[in-house]
Regions:
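ABC ATPase "signature
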Residues: 233-234
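Conserved ABC ATPase "signature" region
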Residues: 23-33, 116, 128-145
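A short, surface-exposed alpha-helical micro-motif characterized by mixed small hydrophobic
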Residues: 215-217
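H-loop/switch region of ABC-family ATPase nucleotide-binding domains
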Residues: 209-210
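Conserved ABC ATPase "signature" C-loop
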Residues: 227-228, 243
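Pre-NBD coupling/linker segments of ABC/ABC-like ATPases
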Residues: 3-46, 237-241, 245-248
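The feature captures the beta-strand-to-loop junction immediately N-terminal to the Walker
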Residues: 64-66
Length: 249
C-alpha cells in the first residue's frame, strides 16, 4: 500500500531562504538582498538517506527514533507534503495525515468554521460535515468553545479538534505524528480506542511516537530511524527493545 524506494531528503544549510514577498521586501530595505547568491554546496545535511520499506494494507507500522532522527520529515514525504531529493514514494489509497497540530486550520477562525475548512482540506463534502458535525463536536469535547477562535486554543484542544475531524470516516491510510500524546489522559485513551476501531476496520497506519508502550500496544511492526537512516525494521517488541537498549546504553 505504501512503498518507499531509496528516499533521500537533503537540506542545504548555506542558502538564505526568502520564503515570502514580505521577507524579500525587508531584505531589500536592509541591504541584505543579493541577486546572485552562491549556494554553499558543502554545507548541507541529509535528513533522510537511503530509506526503503513497504507497508501492506491493514498494517500498523510504528516509526521510532531520537529527536532529529528524521521521523517527521519522513511522514511529510509519505503524505506528499514534501518532495524527496531522491527516490520515490508509491501510495495506493487516500491518506488522512495528522502530522502537525493546526495544519489545515485558519487560526483566526472559530472551531465551528475550522471544522468545515479542515474537513474540506481532507476532502470531505459539506454534506458529510453537516451530517457528522455533532459527532465531531461530541468526540472533541469542545461544544462550549465552538465559537472561539482556534488561536485561543491550547495545543491539547487543537489536537482534539484535529483528531475528531480527521477520523469521522475511517481513512484508508492514517498518518499520525505524536498527536495521541497531546491532551488530557482521558482524551488520549479515547483517541487510542478510536484508532483501534479504525485498525480493526482495515485502516493502514503509520504512527510516530516516543511512547514505546503505545507503539507496542498498537503496532504490528516497527521502523527504527536514526540520523535519517533506517537502523532496523521488524518485530515490534524486538525493535523496541533494541532501540531502548541503545538509548540507555
Amino acid at each position: 500500500m505504501i512503498t518507499l524506494n531509496n528516499i533521500g531528503m537533503k537540506y542545504n544549510l548555506g542558502v538564505e531562504r526568502d520564503n515570502s514577498f514580505k521577507q524579500t521586501f525587508i531584505n531589500v530595505l536592509s541591504g541584505k538582498h543579493r541577486k546572485n547568491k552562491k549556494k554553499k554546496e558543502d554545507n548541507f545535511f541529509w535528513a533522510l538517506k537511503g530509506v526503503n520499506f513497504h507497508i501492506d494494507k491493514g498494517e500498523v507500522v510504528g516509526l521510532i527514533g531520537s529527536n532529529g532522527a528524521g521521523k517527521s520529515t519522513l511522514l511529510k514525504v509519505v503524505s506528499g507534503v514534501m518532495k524527496p531529493t531522491e527516490g520515490s514514494v508509491q501510495v495506493n489509497g487516500q491518506i488522512s495525515p495528522m502530522i502537525e497540530l493546526g495544519a489545515g486550520f485558519d487560526m483566526d477562525l472559530t472551531a465551528r468554521e475550522n471544522i468545515y475548512l479542515n474537513g474540506a482540506v481532507l476532502g470531505y463534502s459539506k454534506e458529510l460535515l453537516d451530517e457528522k458535525f455533532d459527532e465531531i463536536v461530541e468526540f472533541s469535547e469542545l461544544r462550549d468553545f465552538l465559537d472561539v477562535p482556534v488561536k485561543n486554543f491550547s495545543s491539547g484542544m487543537t489536537a482534539k479538534l484535529a483528531f475528531s475531524i480527521a477520523t469521522i470516516v475511517d481513512p484508508e491510510i492514517l498518518i499520525v505524528d505524536e498527536i495521541l500524546s497531546v491532551g488530557d489522559i482521558k482524551f488520549q485513551e479515547k483517541s487510542k480506542n478510536k484508532m483501534m476501531e479504525m485498525i480493526k476496520g482495515g485502516t493502514t497506519v503509520l504512527y510516530v511516537s516516543h511512547a514505546l508502550d503505545s507503539i507496542r500496544d498498537l503496532c504490528t511492526k516497527v521502523v527504527w530511524l536514526e540520523h535519517g537512516v533506517v537502523q532496523e525494521i521488524g518485530d515490534t517488541n524486538e525493535v523496541c527493545d533494541h532501540y531502548y537498549k541503545s538509548q540507555m546504553g
